[in-house]
A protein has these predicted regions:
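The conserved cystathionine-beta-synthase
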Residues: 9-27, 52, 73-93, 98-100, ...
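A glycine-centered beta-loop-beta connector
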Residues: 23-26, 31-47, 87, 96-112
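Hydrophobic pocket-lining "lid/loop/helix" segments that shape and contact the acyl-thioester
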Residues: 2-4, 17, 28, 38
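Short, flexible active-site loop motifs that bind/organize anionic cofactors or intermediates
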Residues: 6-9, 38-39, 73, 104
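Bateman (tandem CBS) regulatory domains
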Residues: 1-7, 60-71
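Helical hairpin unit composed of two closely spaced alpha helices linked by a short loop
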Residues: 27-55, 59-68, 76
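Short Gly/charged-rich anion-binding patches and loops
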Residues: 18, 38, 61, 82, ...
Length: 120
């Protein structure tokens, strides 16, 4: 699991351009969108492709307008095997948002993290 500064995140007031910079700098193919410190959504490479395909000038849009409001979330005390099962549940995803018992952002995990740990 990635934690702290290694977790890509932007506030829900960020622009799409700011979110892309954060995504690119952290190498997870997504950024978590927060509102007052709580998880508000996620913006993934797939969301970016859909946004660009929709036409108009996407760089003028706010991240809150284009994020996925229902990210796949797992609790910090769950097993790595649970992460795999959740990622494989349709529609399949490659990243999970990790929250603590209070529901606050604790980190993020990418399928590549599971590969490196030899979980899959």
């Amino acid at each position: 699991m990635r934690t702290g500064a290694a977790v890509p995140s932007v506030p829900d007031t960020a622009t799409l351009a700011e979110a892309i910079v954060e995504m690119s700098g952290k190498g997870m193919g997504m950024t978590i969108v927060t509102r007052n410190g709580a998880v508000a959504g996620i913006f993934t490479d797939g969301d970016l492709r859909r946004c660009l395909g929709a036409g108009g000038d996407p760089m003028r849009r706010g991240i809150a307008d284009v994020m996925t409001r229902t990210p796949r979330i797992i609790e910090v005390d769950r097993l790595a095997a649970d992460c795999v099962l959740l990622m494989e549940t349709p529609p399949k995803v490659t990243q999970l948002v990790v929250v603590d018992a209070a529901g606050a952002l604790a980190g993020a995990i990418h399928v590549h993290d599971l590969f490196r740990a030899r979980v899959v």
